From Swiss-Prot:
Highest taxon above the source species: Bacteria
Protein name (database record): Putative glycoside/cation symporter YagG
Transmembrane spans: 10-30, 31-51, 79-99, 107-127, 151-171, 180-200, 263-283, 309-329, 367-387, 406-426
Keyword Membrane: yes
Presence of the UniProt keyword Transmembrane in the record: yes
Periplasmic side: 100-106, 172-179, 284-308, 388-405
Subcellular location: Cell inner membrane
Amino acid sequence: MTQLTMKDKIGYGLGDTACGFVWQATMFLLAYFYTDVFGLSAGIMGTLFLVSRVLDAVTDPLMGLLVDRTRTRHGQFRPFLLWGAIPFGIVCVLTFYTPDFSAQGKIIYACVTYILLTLVYTFVNVPYCAMPGVITADPKERHALQSWRFFLAAAGSLAISGIALPLVSIIGKGDEQVGYFGAMCVLGLSGVVLLYVCFFTTKERYTFEVQPGSSVAKDLKLLLGNSQWRIMCAFKMMATCSNVVRGGATLYFVKYVMDHPELATQFLLYGSLATMFGSLCSSRLLGRFDRVTAFKWIIVAYSLISLLIFVTPAEHIALIFALNILFLFVFNTTTPLQWLMASDVVDYEESRSGRRLDGLVFSTYLFSLKIGLAIGGAVVGWILAYVNYSASSSVQPVEVLTTIKILFCVVPVVLYAGMFIMLSLYKLTDARVEAISRQLIKHRAAQGEAVPDAATAASH
């Protein structure tokens, strides 16, 4: 099997640094931007997140079907990075622009730009996420590739947490509307450049012909009959929902519960560093264990850490910082494993039915992710609206403070319990995955299919 170089790993990972600008901005900044800068109410924001994300999620399987049927001189997946980079940067910037419109006009503008943002993210991210299957066929190399991917994705998070807010202050000079727009201009342009770097440095080493007799209905029916795909999608929906609830509550937690808004940049920065190194250490720390068993134990560990943060008095700032750093390091050792699940399900489906559905599996995985994103974003907005959170109040009532703590610490733990249950039903252990990989390699060799394609690999 192909041994990946550092160029392969870093080149691929930089694509998720670019995607991370949008993902992390949506997770950590957009809720605050919409309520406190743009001027939306929390209730409208929550509804916008839900409706926009559900509409967008429907396009993910359609994108997957398109990817599975795309073959160009640049390969199957890489062309979408080339075509989508510039629209990606433009829409990212427009989402954080505050127009001088009426209240109704602003709502319409927010809906249009947010939907466009999620659509262009889908156009780039679905094929990007599906690429590991044609970069390498080795499960261990895929783990290493995903570790570097999420290390560099966390660099995108670091840019948001460590650079975005200072840029807002520097560019805006007290005007947050100008500041957010200017900061996202810088980050959007950087994202375009990084997507092009990813395009030129990655290689699709394996090619698969479009399989005869395929149809949308047949492909969807196959996946619906795949128990491991169903478990994977339910798992990812809960995992994403937990991330978004916690991430969406982060700035509120620092500003109101800890009562130190000036520490927001440091809180996000240190958390991003922990995220980076947790992802990078994943294959080294967990590679020696069965991935499913290790994942379950890690869920227990970070659930306990989250509950410790909940019971820690707000005045113990250093302890909260330390626990948050520990939480994010431990949590993110499992992030590469989440995406390995999708690659494993692709191989499992091929061994089960003979159909290789990289695009459809990863797009439906992203569909689950976006449903989780929609629910999580809506939960934050609706619950804050229910307890009468007001952005104009510098001091929040005790009920609001307690609710923010619950959103940050307790609601995610409930979802972690659901993730644990899903993993208890998941059967694609290391031994099973390696056996499937060997089986597929023998079958392809016998059929003369999917051998490394030097011409395709060299096509940049």
